[in-house]
Amino acid sequence: GNCNLRCEWCDTNFDEYEQKSVDEIMQEINSYDCKNIVFTGGEPMLNDLWPLARTLKHDGYHLSIESNGTIAIPEGLIDWICISPKDQMYPNVSIKQRTGDELKCVYVGQSLDMYEPLKQGFSHLFLQPCYDENATVEENGRGFALTEAVVKAHPEWRLSLQTHKWMGIL
């Protein structure tokens, strides 16, 4: 995958990915007993997803996308839209996708006021503590505790964890 932001905490390996045709991807997908597909990492909107998305929808798949929101998502094919803006790192980047199902913000201590104009377009609000692979368990734990305290003080937000990182899976 590729991304137009490349945040330092991202778990996407931008150097190792393989281009495949829709047929090759569908062959791989059909080998699994699953009907839920998530387009993610880096920034999926930089790719031409629509031929694959149309094929998946035709075959009965539920489609979700996680995007940084800098590119508008066409209506009609995606069932669940998660926007994860990076305003805290890139304050001058314009968010083009201002509606969706889920607003997920990586929390690094920024004021939640910055999301006021944006959060009205979403039905679910999530704060995710920033997990730093180079930090100690204690440092990451402090980030988690800070995020948890902010969520408790702002009950319209929910806590979101990247459990795979905490477990050392990726």
PLM regions and their residue ranges:
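Short N-terminal micro-motifs specific to bacterial/archaeal maturation
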Residues: 1, 16, 104-106, 138
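Conserved Radical SAM active-site core
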Residues: 1-79
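Auxiliary Fe-S-binding modules of radical SAM enzymes
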Residues: 31-34, 110-170
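Active-site beta-loop-alpha junctions enriched in small/polar residues
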Residues: 42-44, 68-70, 86, 106-108, ...
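Radical SAM/AdoMet-radical enzyme domain recognition
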Residues: 49-123
